[in-house]
């Protein structure tokens, strides 16, 4: 048979393990949310211009093509021509 002091120690350990497990679950959720990395993928790629031998144009990746020497202009037009799909 278990003595009362052994039973008390067992109960303290059991309660401590439950509290530790609850803490780890909360900590794990925080770490999961903090580890979500957002990667920006430009809608434009560098390509060779039709009028040049160098890769100095930026063209849309999507269905509708547009090329520009300026990356900002390309991104703006590509997002207008090929809007990103909504996330599920």
Swiss-Prot record:
Per the record, the domain of life is Eukaryota
Q: Which UniProt keywords apply?
A: Disulfide bond, Signal
Which cysteines pair up through disulfides? They are: 44-59, 49-78, 57-74, 60-67
Chain segments annotated as transmembrane: none
Q: Give tissue specificity per the record.
A: Expressed in stems.
Q: Which segment of the chain is annotated as a signal peptide?
A: 1-23
Protein family: Belongs to the MEG family.
* Official protein name in the record: EMBRYO SURROUNDING FACTOR 1-like protein 11
Q: What is the lineage of its organism?
A: Eukaryota, Viridiplantae, Streptophyta, Embryophyta, Tracheophyta
């Amino acid at each position: 048979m278990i003595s009362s002091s052994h039973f008390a120690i067992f109960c303290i350990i059991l309660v401590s393990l439950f509290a530790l497990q609850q803490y780890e679950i909360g900590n794990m959720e925080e770490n999961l949310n903090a580890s979500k990395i957002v990667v920006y993928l430009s809608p434009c790629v560098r390509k060779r211009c039709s009028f040049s031998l160098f890769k100095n144009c930026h063209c849309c990746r999507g269905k509708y093509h547009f090329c520009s020497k300026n990356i900002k202009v390309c991104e703006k037009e590509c997002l207008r021509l090929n809007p990103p799909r909504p996330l599920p």
